[in-house]
């Protein structure tokens, strides 16, 4: 559900006239079908009879004990992969107010269908700002662009605190003449440890004040491996996003699945839903994590 903010002020009323009725603002309800994220890994008796990673050469671990270790490691690895997919979706939502995902039915990287989900109405995204020049020019008015981006947020009653950008943009910002003058180098304490907690891949290179707004300059260089085995930046190249903490949220859909234990369907409300299936004839065990993430980065 969404409700547009406003900048209305209360009316002035003539004496002895009571009050002036102000209509309540309406809201919009949208229904989304979230995408399915389901990495799967098989486990066979051959896997359990082999020495595991990090085990002693003459290990005394039984296949039964090794099964618990392997499944635990698989759960951790698959969950980390899901974290990466969620981060990819969040970054795409920040950059494009939505995302286009590839849905695979068989082998990863082969045939797929596209899944599209966007969080704006109409043909274009009105929250996207296009500069009039190139930030690579040290004399270009980056401050003017940031001022315009700030107003896009504050005009809707939203805060502007963090400028998150691709690693290749870092040099453009640092070398800009106007930015150099605004960077607060007076607060650099030589020999003093003053850590700032930031997610992996995020580096705060400074703080600038624009019209009373303290803007954190954050370079984000975290990467992921795509379907072709190539490393890509979550933020892509040449991208800048002005946002604020807690400006988005993650929503998860319910997962209904047939359980092998009782042969019945069960529905789960959780961000991680494991599914175990066993094939007695083929002696295999499959593990599937099935979350339904929907990352909405609100502008």
Each model region followed by its residue ranges:
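Assembly/oligomerization interface modules of large self-assembling protein complexes
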Residues: 1-56
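Short, surface-exposed beta-strand/loop "edge" segments at domain boundaries and coil↔beta transitions
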Residues: 6-8, 248-254, 294
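Long, contiguous amphipathic alpha-helices that act as assembly "spine/axial" helices in icosahedral shell
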Residues: 35-121, 145-171, 278-287
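Short N-terminal edge-element motif at the start of the domain
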Residues: 128-148
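Extended oligomerization regions of viral-like shell subunits
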Residues: 156-252
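C-terminal structured domain segments
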Residues: 231-287
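Conserved small/polar residues in nucleotide/adenosyl-binding loops
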Residues: 288-293
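Extended, polar beta-sheet/loop recognition surfaces of beta-rich domains
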Residues: 296-298
